[in-house]
Swiss-Prot record:
Database matches in Pfam families: MMM1 (PF10296)
Gene from which this protein is expressed: mmm1
CC terms in the record's Gene Ontology section: cytoplasm; endoplasmic reticulum; endoplasmic reticulum membrane; ERMES complex
Protein name: Maintenance of mitochondrial morphology protein 1
Organism: Schizosaccharomyces pombe (strain 972 / ATCC 24843)
Biological processes, Gene Ontology terms: aminophospholipid transport; intermembrane phospholipid transfer; mitochondrial genome maintenance; mitochondrial membrane organization; mitochondrion-endoplasmic reticulum membrane tethering; protein insertion into mitochondrial outer membrane
Family to which the UniProt record says this protein belongs: Belongs to the MMM1 family.
TM ranges: 13-33
InterPro entries for the chain: Mmm1, MMM1_dom, SMP_LBD
Length: 313
């Protein structure tokens, strides 16, 4: 027969209750009712013994500068290797891109033909760009056809930029076989012995039948001072463009397809394209800023009360 010491059960019960109360107290004291760590302390980097804390007072602007790191405007070489290996990546066919361009071009032609908006725009450009108004009368665009073919992009490659090895450029071949034609009517002015002494009717039709070339696309990053980023497009100097120019001069006795007029029109078209689109020249497309600036936000807020008051009236 085993004899238990008296009071063992009572002592165990008391000790167990005390331990339970102690655990509950620790949990409530250090997990529920403790004061949170300040965000400035939590977000600040750990300082070593050799570093001295900054004694300048913090402002919201300075906090933003510490919180947001300045994004990269160019890709680092190791990032480029992860995204695209310029040395081993095979050229792409761009079949999917051709389908998207074809759909966009269909809509563009439809919009251009609506109410002859493209015809009027071209007429304005031709009259504005006429160099010698004393020899040529007002230019009228009689007919304009944007064709029914589609450009084919192929053999796309991504290469380092020629002037900046840390940036990339995309090169692709483009070919277009179509019948894009424009017919203009004007008058040649004879200014002797007096201004506009006689006029000579002139009708010119220009057809673009084929174009083959290499297009280069690269980006110009923003400088952060209000200047947007740009997408630049340029063509290689070794391009091929096939033109057909027909001319008709005179009212009654008409002269057709004068070689000198054909050569002059072809050289002017090639010169216009070279001076604007052929490397080192390029065309730029501004990339819109998706993040509104404080000035734009303030402008929107200033107009909001006026709109509400007008609606109430």
């Amino acid at each position: 027969m085993i004899h238990l010491p008296q009071g063992s059960f009572t002592q165990g019960l008391i000790v167990g209750q005390l331990l339970t109360l102690a655990i509950i107290y620790v949990f409530l004291r250090f997990f529920l009712f403790c004061s949170p760590i300040p965000k400035s302390v939590a977000n600040s980097p750990k300082q070593t013994g050799n570093e001295t804390p900054d004694e300048t007072p913090s402002t919201p602007l300075s906090n933003n500068k510490k919180r947001y790191k300045k994004p990269l405007t160019i890709l680092e070489p190791h990032i480029l290797n992860l995204l695209y290996d310029v040395n081993e990546h095979e050229p792409e066919s761009l079949d999917w891109f051709n389908v998207l361009i074809a759909q966009a071009l269909i809509q563009f032609r439809y919009d251009a033909c609506s109410n002859d908006v493209a015809l009027r725009k071209l007429e304005t450009v031709l009259n504005k760009g006429a160099q010698d108004k004393s020899m040529v009368d007002h230019i009228y665009v009689r007919d304009l056809s944007l064709g029914d073919g589609f450009p084919v992009f192929s053999h796309c490659r991504v290469l380092p930029h020629q002037h900046n090895s840390s940036q990339l450029r995309a090169e692709m071949l483009v070919s277009l076989t179509d019948n894009i034609n424009c017919t203009v009517d004007t008058k040649l002015l004879l200014n002797f012995p007096k201004p506009a002494f006689a006029t000579l009717p002139l009708s010119i039709t220009v057809r673009i039948c084929k174009f083959v070339g290499k297009i280069m696309i690269y980006f110009s990053p923003s400088n952060g001072a209000g200047q947007p980023a740009y997408m630049n497009l340029s063509f290689d100097p070794n391009f091929v463009i096939s033109l057909q120019v027909s001319s008709l001069v005179g009212a009654r006795s008409k002269l057709q397809d004068i070689p000198k007029i054909t050569q002059l029109i072809e050289s002017r078209i090639r010169q216009w394209f070279t001076n604007r689109c052929v490397s080192p020249q390029f065309q730029q497309i501004a990339i819109p800023n998706l993040w509104p600036t404080s000035a734009k936000e303030g402008h929107a807020r200033s107009h909001a009360p006026q709109e509400e008051s007008s609606n109430e009236d």
